[in-house]
Amino acid sequence: MTKEKRLIATNKTEEERDRLTEVWKKRIVSEKGYSETIAERIAEKVKSLADYMQYGHAIIAYYRQNGSFQLVTGTLISYSKDFHHSYDMKQVHSTFIFWCMEEKGWRTFLIENFLDWKPIV
């Protein structure tokens, strides 16, 4: 692949990620009533979480749909093995899936219920 083609592919990926951020922002604003600035911060944090969890473990804070607070350790390392295809963030429209280390199973949370995350190093 030439340098020019790689640059075009990288730009296309960035455009897709930006569109995804916009979709998540609209969802967060409509569901929670947050400002666009706060919604954008949340969307960016979810993107960085997804990027990190493909190769490592993270502590994730979020609310369940019933309102209970959750603080769990999660990862996406085994995603491709379990689902037989690679993780694609563009497929995340409203629900984020992850492997919960405590419960030893796949769990989800709604994007608008996400609070924060920290890497486990």
Segment roles from a protein language model:
Residues 64, 68-89:
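Acidic, low-complexity, intrinsically disordered interaction modules
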Residues 81-82, 103-121:
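Structured surface patches comprising rigid loops and adjacent beta-strands/short helices at the edges
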Residues 2-68:
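Short glycine-rich, low-complexity segments
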Residues 89-97:
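Short aromatic-glycine-enriched beta-strand elements
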Residues 60-62, 96-101:
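SH3/SH3-like beta-barrel fold
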Residues 57-59, 95, 106:
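Short, acidic/polar N-cap/turn motifs at the starts of alpha helices
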